Amino acid sequence: MATPHHSRRGSMAYYPRVRAKSIEPRIRSWPEISGPVKVQGFAGFKVGMTHVEMVDYRKTSVTAGQPIFVPVTVIEVPPLDVIGIRLYDEDEEGNMVVVYEKWTQNLDKELFKKITTFKEVKEKPVPETYADVRLIVATRNKDVPGIPSKKPEIFELRIGGGNSVKERFEYATAHLGKTIRFEDFSKPGKFVDVLSVTKGKGFTGHVQRFGVKLLPRKNRKHRRMIGTLGPWHPDWVRNTVPQAGQMGYQQRTISNVRVLKYSKGEDADTINVRGGFLHYGLVKNDYVLLFGSVPGPAKRLIKMRDPARQKVPDIDNVKLDYISLESKQGD
């Protein structure tokens, strides 16, 4: 008879399991894309979840072409203000260094709560010789009633596409001091990667954190803990041993999330549920519906980028027959 065996409980894919350095997710890599020049990312605030009825567009599904109910996440995506441009180049060691930086002259006073000095790199830009072009954008927290903090978040978005870095630089220059919308980044039917910091659970035990098996009923003193810290040798506790500690409040990336709908702020009433969304309120700006769930609680900043490993082709249109606006308060 074969020896019974199961895989280890708890993934080793995400280590160390510590709190994120910032509540704002960080995009560490950008995929290369083809086609016209465009911005490769966007950001919004998580509102909550509801469900929609739609025609199943998945050709290999058993319900292909039939109406189905699916859960969706509502993300409020007000326009982003383009407040600066950065050009990057590689040094001898392959590190990306800033070689050109320019800020708009029309800076909102709210930005000085985040950055006290705006230093420009005065080197004359020669885009053809550089490696990357980024937009420096700021969120409009003051236009979102559901967000308690009115201090804007400032971050970079890569510009991709086109035939040369010069085209991307011209695109960035044309948008400096203006705003960009979600439609400049993506549209319904396309995939995006979603980055967010998950809900924080605090200090939790072995069972909740790793899903290890409960010890027998007659075990001495404890049941909700591990049976051993490891072998005698090596004579230290290895990091593969499941132990109690921080759970949640960690950055995660969800790949290939389908955009089901995008709508302008004038049509916000088409998504506001009865009584408002829990812990958020009402949507007042542009919003987008994403298939399924995304990490993080309501009000958290959510970043999106072009998919890095897309496996399924985009579709031209998603047909939504019904959006549930029933109260989420349990009545």
Swiss-Prot record:
It comes from the Archaea. GO terms for molecular function: rRNA binding; structural constituent of ribosome. InterPro entries: L3_arc_euk, Ribosomal_L3_dom_3_arc_sf, Ribosomal_uL3, Ribosomal_uL3_arc, Transl_B-barrel_sf. Pfam families: Ribosomal_L3 (PF00297). GO terms for biological process: translation. Keywords: Ribonucleoprotein, Ribosomal protein, RNA-binding, rRNA-binding. Disulfide bonds: none annotated. GO terms for cellular component: cytosolic large ribosomal subunit. HAMAP family: Ribosomal_uL3_A. Part of the 50S ribosomal subunit. Forms a cluster with proteins L14 and L24e. One of the primary rRNA binding proteins, it binds directly near the 3'-end of the 23S rRNA, where it nucleates assembly of the 50S subunit. Belongs to the universal ribosomal protein uL3 family. This is Large ribosomal subunit protein uL3. It comes from Thermoplasma volcanium (strain ATCC 51530 / DSM 4299 / JCM 9571 / NBRC 15438 / GSS1). The lineage of its organism: Archaea, Methanobacteriati, Thermoplasmatota, Thermoplasmata, Thermoplasmatales. The gene is rpl3.
